[in-house]
A protein has these predicted regions:
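N-terminal type II signal-anchor transmembrane helix
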Residues: 1-35, 75, 95
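Peptidoglycan glycan-strand catalytic modules in the bacterial/periplasmic cell-wall system
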Residues: 29-31, 35-187
């Protein structure tokens, strides 16, 4: 029964499911930067809050990657998109009233939610279906991308607020620096 249900969700029979093409080529909106002849940025143009500039994995400081994994998904390298131990921890926290048990979403699930957002106001059944969809999309993302590519997409897409979308914009807006110059405590 459970596998059949996941098959229906995965096949898009129970609501939206991104196509293989959409998973392989997610829409990314990066800011357009205008440079002077001497290399200084004259201006930026971006849509909505998508004030971001792409950053390669090799250019992301290890301290930023370590901070992300330590705070969001300590078993990131040990799962395939769904952290079953984390889900049991959250369920136990809900049953015992322990609100400090933390969340159960993995970095990949959070990326799935960022890449394929859905309506915010939903009833319990719609929320449950959205969570199942996130799990399926997370597993598909893990099959399509390396862990490094997932971290790169996440850090280039995450909204740090105040028009700081992506690690490049966040480092600049909050610390007036570039990601490679962030101190460990800033990461």
């Amino acid at each position: 029964g459970v596998f059949f249900f996941f098959y229906l969700v995965s096949a898009g029979k129970l609501g939206f499911m991104p196509t293989f093409e959409e998973l392989e080529n997610p829409k990314n909106k990066f800011a357009t930067e205008i440079y002077s002849e001497d290399g200084k940025i004259l201006g930026k143009y971006f849509e909505g809050s998508e004030n971001r500039r792409y950053m390669d994995y090799k250019d992301i400081p290890q301290s930023v990657i370590d901070a992300l994994i330590a705070t969001e998904d300590v078993r990131f390298y040990d799962h395939s998109g769904i952290d079953v131990r984390g889900l049991f921890r959250v369920a136990q926290g809900m049953l015992t009233g322990n609100s400090s048990a933390g969340g159960g979403s993995t970095i990949t699930q959070q990326l799935a939610k960022m890449l394929f957002p859905r309506e915010a106001n939903q009833n319990f059944m719609e929320l449950a279906m959205r969570k199942f969809r996130e799990w399926v999309i997370a597993v598909k993302l893990e099959k399509s991308y390396t862990k490094e590519e997932i971290i790169t997409m996440y850090l280039n897409k995450f909204d740090f607020l105040n028009l700081a979308v992506g690690i490049n914009s966040a480092a600049n807006i909050y610390f007036s620096t570039t990601p490679d110059s962030l101190k460990v405590e800033q990461a």
